[in-house]
Amino acid sequence: MSIEIRKLSIEDLETLIEVARESWKWTYAGIYSEEYIESWIREKYSKEKLLNEIVRSQSNLDILFLGAFADSTLIGFIELKIIANKAELLRLYLKPEYTHKKIGKTLLLEAEKIMKKKGILECRLYVHRQNSVGFSFYYKNGFKVEDTDGSDFIMEKKYES
């Protein structure tokens, strides 16, 4: 299986929402109710919201939105918001059957290459305390817990200039 990483396009919108739904249900089962997950998906992954973020990413503005594709099918994505020399990792999700296959790491490394070219010195993210898979992934990839915010760990990774 070959994996292609590229910026998401408008044509990826429907599949992006489905990947998000599958991933959220798998990641947060036992943490949040199914009703809460569906409500979150409707609010945070609405077509209008994602379309705006895809367009901003294509225009190289303040959003970097990359997809991982297996045989031309979207299987995961990463989204970062960039402000000056800092980035916030907003989302990194994979279809459940593609976890633990180094695809998340490939997405993160590709995003980090782009961040370095943009002069990003630090990346921050929030991960739910009970999301042990996510926490372990970020920790193994160089992120350290810097603080907490409610039910989330705030993790950061510093980069050389």
UniProtKB/Swiss-Prot annotation:
<feature type="binding site">
    <location>
        <position position="140"/>
    </location>
    <ligand>
        <name>acetyl-CoA</name>
    </ligand>
</feature>
<dbReference type="InterPro" id="IPR016181">
    <property type="entry name" value="Acyl_CoA_acyltransferase"/>
</dbReference>
<dbReference type="GO" id="GO:0004145">
    <property type="term" value="F:diamine N-acetyltransferase activity"/>
</dbReference>
<dbReference type="GO" id="GO:0043939">
    <property type="term" value="P:negative regulation of sporulation"/>
</dbReference>
<feature type="active site" description="Proton donor">
    <location>
        <position position="138"/>
    </location>
</feature>
<comment type="function">
    <text>Involved in the protection against polyamine toxicity by regulating their concentration. Could also be involved in the negative control of sporulation as well as production of degradative enzymes such as alpha-amylase, levansucrase and alkaline phosphatase. Catalyzes the transfer of an acetyl group from acetyl coenzyme A (AcCoA) to an acceptor substrate and release both CoA and the acetylated product. It can use a variety of substrates including spermidine, L-tryptophan, L-leucine, L-lysine, dopamine and tyramine.</text>
</comment>
<keyword id="KW-0808">Transferase</keyword>
<feature type="site" description="May have an important role in the acetylation of the polyamine">
    <location>
        <position position="142"/>
    </location>
</feature>
<keyword id="KW-0012">Acyltransferase</keyword>
<feature type="binding site">
    <location>
        <begin position="92"/>
        <end position="94"/>
    </location>
    <ligand>
        <name>acetyl-CoA</name>
    </ligand>
</feature>
<dbReference type="Pfam" id="PF00583">
    <property type="entry name" value="Acetyltransf_1"/>
</dbReference>
<feature type="domain" description="N-acetyltransferase">
    <location>
        <begin position="3"/>
        <end position="160"/>
    </location>
</feature>
<comment type="similarity">
    <text>Belongs to the acetyltransferase family.</text>
</comment>
<dbReference type="InterPro" id="IPR050276">
    <property type="entry name" value="MshD_Acetyltransferase"/>
</dbReference>
<feature type="binding site">
    <location>
        <position position="131"/>
    </location>
    <ligand>
        <name>acetyl-CoA</name>
    </ligand>
</feature>
<dbReference type="InterPro" id="IPR000182">
    <property type="entry name" value="GNAT_dom"/>
</dbReference>
<feature type="binding site">
    <location>
        <begin position="99"/>
        <end position="104"/>
    </location>
    <ligand>
        <name>acetyl-CoA</name>
    </ligand>
</feature>
<comment type="subunit">
    <text>Monomer or homodimer.</text>
</comment>
<protein>
    <recommendedName>
        <fullName>Spermidine N(1)-acetyltransferase</fullName>
        <ecNumber>2.3.1.57</ecNumber>
    </recommendedName>
</protein>
<feature type="binding site">
    <location>
        <position position="136"/>
    </location>
    <ligand>
        <name>acetyl-CoA</name>
    </ligand>
</feature>
